[in-house]
Amino acid sequence: AMLGYRFRISGIVVHGRHQGHAIGFPTANVQYDSEYLLPKSGVYAGYVVFDNKRYEAMINLGHNPTFNYRNDMSLEAHILDFNQELYGRYVGVEFVRFIRDEKRFNSKGNLIMQLEQDILNTKKILKEYE
């Protein structure tokens, strides 16, 4: 479902466990204030905003069930076609549309195939949205 406005969470990019990087999908791990009311966990198409620029991103909000389940919700964004370091930067993460629920994958290969599909879906959604 489309929200009437873009839901946005802001925070500082911190070092995560670099698992995304290890499989070719580096993500910005955003540490956000605990008082945010969060949307449901899952994968979203959206944007990461900093320096007054908006970058297309595949966003994952959730518990990282494939690698090691976390109780708190982690917020990670894979910025499309982007390779700068953002550690320590204050960024906004804007959610445009829900793509799918979070799920546990039984292999890295399956996870990678799904992430590639998620990126295609993200591009398609954001293209329609602009």
Regions found by a protein language model. Give the residues of each.
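Phosphate/ribose-recognition catalytic cores of enzymes acting on nucleotide-derived substrates
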Residues: 15-130
